[in-house]
């Protein structure tokens, strides 16, 4: 092989590597943008089942993680049948992390996801309702109703006023009737959910969601 041919091959290999790197960087950038648009908090951008496998999943939540992964493997069927997840347990038990892992799988499959904490959801509705232009609020409520996977983080952390409870009832009822999945994380126990909200909210969540619980101390590590 002469020097010219060898150089051409080397240049081709080098360019191929560059293109591969560029494509991977674009894929990551696109994924980050999609996570942002879905409302995923920046702290959880790195959450994925792949990361759990690579870094190790704590034994205390392994069973819950396995169930979440099983759910994620059948996203299309779960979306069509309106099946969701309800993660409950004490703080720091990876409930939000696992919910985001599921969300990431859905986003990578180009399925609609919207993640929002309950306090933020209701604060947003209050703020928008004070605006004379109600179009913004209608668009927000349409997204809550119609997105394929709605993730309600910190369910039960919202202030329990009557209108708040009614709004929660309306959201759950609408998605239940239209067979839209809801994925919930909460520090409340199932019996506390039943006591906080009207009976039909609890019944609808229980009948359409895989209930996954975790008990014990927080798994979060203190900053060094």
Which residues does each predicted region cover?
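Interdomain "pre-motor" coupling segment immediately N-terminal to P-loop NTPase/helicase cores
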Residues: 1-42
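Conserved catalytic network of the ASCE P-loop NTPase/AAA+ motor domain
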Residues: 77-79, 106-107, 142-145, 173-178, ...
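Conserved adenine-nucleotide phosphate-binding loops and their immediately adjacent elements
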Residues: 40-53
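Loop/turn-to-beta-strand initiation segments
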Residues: 111-112, 146-150, 178-184
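Walker A/P-loop nucleotide-binding motif
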Residues: 77-99
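N-terminal pre-Walker A segment at the start of P-loop NTPase domains
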Residues: 50-78
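Short glycine-rich substrate-engagement loop in P-loop NTPases that contacts/grips substrate
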Residues: 61-68, 103-146, 159-162
């Amino acid at each position: 092989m002469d020097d010219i041919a060898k150089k051409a091959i080397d240049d081709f290999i080098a360019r191929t590597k560059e293109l591969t790197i560029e494509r991977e960087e674009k894929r990551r950038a696109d994924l980050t943008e999609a996570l942002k648009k879905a409302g995923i908090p920046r702290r959880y951008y790195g959450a994925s089942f792949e990361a759990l496998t690579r870094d190790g999943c704590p034994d205390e939540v392994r069973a819950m993680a396995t169930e979440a992964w099983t759910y994620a493997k059948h996203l299309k069927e779960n979306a069509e049948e309106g099946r969701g997840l309800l993660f409950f347990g004490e703080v720091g038990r990876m409930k939000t992390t696992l919910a985001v892992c599921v969300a990431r799988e859905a986003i990578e499959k180009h399925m609609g996801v919207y993640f929002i904490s309950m306090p933020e959801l209701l604060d947003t509705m209050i703020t928008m309702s004070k605006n004379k232009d109600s179009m913004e609020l209608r668009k927000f409520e349409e997204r809550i109703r119609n997105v394929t996977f709605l993730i309600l983080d910190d369910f039960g952390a919202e202030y329990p006023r009557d209108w708040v409870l009614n709004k929660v009832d309306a959201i759950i009822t609408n998605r239940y009737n239209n067979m839209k999945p809801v994925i919930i994380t909460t520090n409340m126990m199932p019996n506390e959910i039943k006591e906080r909200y009207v009976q039909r909210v609890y019944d609808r969540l229980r009948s359409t969601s895989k209930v996954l619980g975790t008990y014990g101390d927080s798994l979060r590590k203190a900053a060094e």
